[in-house]
Amino acid sequence: MSEFWLCFSCCIAEQPQPKRRRRIDRSMIGEPTNFAHTAHVGSGDLFSGMNSVSSIQNQMQSKGGYGGGMPANVQMQLVDTKAG
């Protein structure tokens, strides 16, 4: 008996190699351009109520650069995600 090998290249597609994400280190990150510091906002500021959020928005608008926006009423539900 003899062996007979036949290759069906049309049926077997070569699997693409998974793309590796390029690692970024500190030397690849440049200084910010056109940066304007307007306010400090922490997670505790949002939990203190909507008056605080409104105050932060007013503070940021007073610094300038926010003239293109339109006012909008937004309702947010805060969810406590404490790890047990």
Curated annotation (Swiss-Prot):
GO molecular function: small GTPase binding
Residue numbers with lipid attached (S-palmitoyl cysteine): C10, C11
Top-level division of the source organism's lineage: Eukaryota
UniProt xrefs under PROSITE patterns: CRIB
Domain CRIB per the UniProt entry, residue ranges: 29-42
Membrane association type: Lipid-anchor
The entry's keywords: Cell membrane, Cell projection, Cell shape, Cytoplasm, Cytoskeleton, Lipoprotein, Membrane, Palmitate, Phagocytosis, Phosphoprotein
A single Gene Ontology CC term: cytoskeleton
Chief location category: cytoplasm
Record InterPro entries: CRIB_dom, CRIB_dom_sf, SPEC
Cellular compartment(s): Cytoplasm, Cytoskeleton; Cell membrane; Cell projection, Phagocytic cup
Gene Ontology biological-process annotations: phagocytosis; regulation of cell shape; regulation of Rho protein signal transduction; regulation of signal transduction
Gene3D superfamilies membership: CRIB domain
Phosphoserine: residues carrying this PTM: S43, S52
Entry comment, domain topic: The CRIB domain mediates interaction with CDC42.
Record's function text: Probably involved in the organization of the actin cytoskeleton by acting downstream of CDC42, inducing actin filament assembly. Alters CDC42-induced cell shape changes. In activated T-cells, may play a role in CDC42-mediated F-actin accumulation at the immunological synapse. May play a role in early contractile events in phagocytosis in macrophages.
Similarity comment: Belongs to the CDC42SE/SPEC family.
Xref: PANTHER family: CDC42 SMALL EFFECTOR PROTEIN 2 (PTHR13502:SF4), CDC42 SMALL EFFECTOR PROTEIN HOMOLOG (PTHR13502)
Subunit structure as annotated in this protein's UniProt entry: Interacts with CDC42 (in GTP-bound form). Interacts weakly with RAC1 and not at all with RHOA.
Record protein name field: CDC42 small effector protein 2
Native organism: Pongo abelii (Sumatran orangutan)
